[in-house]
């Protein structure tokens, strides 16, 4: 029944009827046939514009590649012109298909001739499968004129627009036609982008560089950040915090604080080595004043090199004064027998006091020291050692002459007292020996008291008006002398002498020079005074 049904269906379609017909084999079954061949073509898509009345061309290339070109009908082209608004010459004349071919093994084709009613069977040679290609892209620039670009631009704007409207740059391009092959190439790329959803032209195309007046159409989301181009100088550069010369104020201020701290440290360290001249309270007070001056100076002055140079000069000045003081005042330290020559200490302390206002003025005015140049330090403060030593020798010679006159009177009184006591004690030897011992002790105590009183009187006469802290320091030095009468010139602080131990070998040659000066000035050398005292003591012993 199936066969009958199929025959009926086939007979109805071919209008053959129920009669029996002869089946013939075609020329393809003949092995000597080389002129006739039958092939089948399978299309993936066949447009309605294909003209069936015209012949198509099949091109078989190497490696079984086949290209089929099918012409389009004129009616289809006219319909396309009406829909898309294109001109007559802008239509696509044909459709191109490309694919590959494969040989058949056992496939046949039946051909029915309606005129004769004969049925012929032919053998199939190849099966060709092709797909539609966009070969009109390559052929289109040759045939498209420039005036067709504005309409395509409008269409392209509708394809690329997000809301279906033509963007403003596209509308501007649609107003003016483009000339030359560039417009044709532009149109071809637009056709491609309408299908693939890509940008309408490359960003770095040569056309964009040659015509800077044309606006650049870029389709991107509004949330994306603008790309920074290093070659474009007009764009805003990234904001980077720049360090200028004004920002150096903080660094210089910090360095300035360090310099002031070094000044205060060096000055307080040098002042701590002289407790007899400057008290600890006054040094701390001066340190605070220097810090206050340093803070004020940070606002007015920004020059750091003078600050760096000041501590070195200040440290060099104070050891120079220390050498002068040690050379003038410590010449009698190795001899403890010169206890009675304590008035020598008076002019040297006065000389210390004369020099002390200069040092205090230097410490209380660091701002003035910074304003001076390095050369002014040597001319104003660092006096030559020869001038200092000559002045000290003159002052010492005058003071020793006065002290020698006082001692001569005391020695004369002591000798007369000893002679009278020896005559009175000759009657009673036992009681005389005891009284001599007591009188000698009393005389030594009286002499010490008289010397202290004379020192106080000389202090009051020679001393100039001094600041409050200097008076306080002088009272401390007097109390120190009263408490330690047997030290003589050793009342200078041990810390100060230990601070300058390398200067102690100098007093011995200075002592020899000073003894010669004392003798030439009419005073008594130290050796003669000691011999007189020993003779007086020996005479008292002989009388006993």
UniProtKB/Swiss-Prot annotation:
Compartment(s): Nucleus
Region annotated Disordered, chain positions: 147-544
The entry's keywords: Activator, Developmental protein, Nucleus, Phosphoprotein, Transcription, Transcription regulation
Function, as annotated: Promotes transcriptional elongation by Su(Tpl)/ELL. Essential for development.
Skewed-composition ranges (Basic and acidic residues): 193-202
Residue stretches spanning the membrane: none
Compositional bias annotation for Low complexity: 264-273, 305-319, 333-374, 396-407, 450-483, 503-513, 526-544
Any single GO CC term annotated in Swiss-Prot or TrEMBL for this entry: nucleoplasm
InterPro entries: EAF_fam (IPR027093), Tscrpt_elong_fac_Eaf_N (IPR019194)
GO molecular function: transcription elongation factor activity
Family the UniProt entry places it in: Belongs to the EAF family.
Keyword Signal: no
Modified residue annotations for Phosphoserine: 205
Name this protein carries in UniProt: Ell-associated factor Eaf
Bias kind Basic residues: ranges: 287-299
Keyword Oxidoreductase: no
BP GO annotations: cellular response to heat; positive regulation of DNA-templated transcription; transcription elongation by RNA polymerase II
Top-level taxon: Eukaryota
Acidic residues bias locations: 425-440
